[in-house]
Regions:
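Short, flexible, surface-exposed loop segments at domain boundaries
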Residues: 2-35, 50-89
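Short, basic/aromatic beta-hairpin or loop at an interaction surface
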Residues: 32-44
Length: 89
């Protein structure tokens, strides 16, 4: 039986940049200076890559996000300090 590391490195989609999460008030997410709507089926991932409900998500922090074709937030990843450092290189 193979055992995965407890906190394996996450793979993110290409062409995404770190942004600053400034607030979550379902169904809206404030990222940098813009307010987006969370897409139907949109997912927020915490630093352990678990899906969290919008009301349980941190209100601030560094994130990566992906938009759907309508401009809604489809996926949002809360970043760890290590990921922030790695993406800043």
């Amino acid at each position: 039986m193979l055992i995965a590391p407890a906190h394996a490195e996450r793979n993110f989609p290409p062409n995404v940049k770190p942004a600053e999460l400034r607030g979550v008030e379902y169904p809206y997410v404030r990222i940098d200076d813009r307010t987006y709507r969370l897409a139907p089926g949109g997912r927020i991932y915490d630093t352990f890559n678990r899906i969290v409900l919008p009301n349980a998500a941190p209100k601030t922090g560094k994130v990566l996000f992906k938009l759907d074709p309508q401009g809604n937030v489809l996926k949002l990843w809360i970043l760890t300090p290590e990921e922030i450092a790695r993406l800043s290189q």
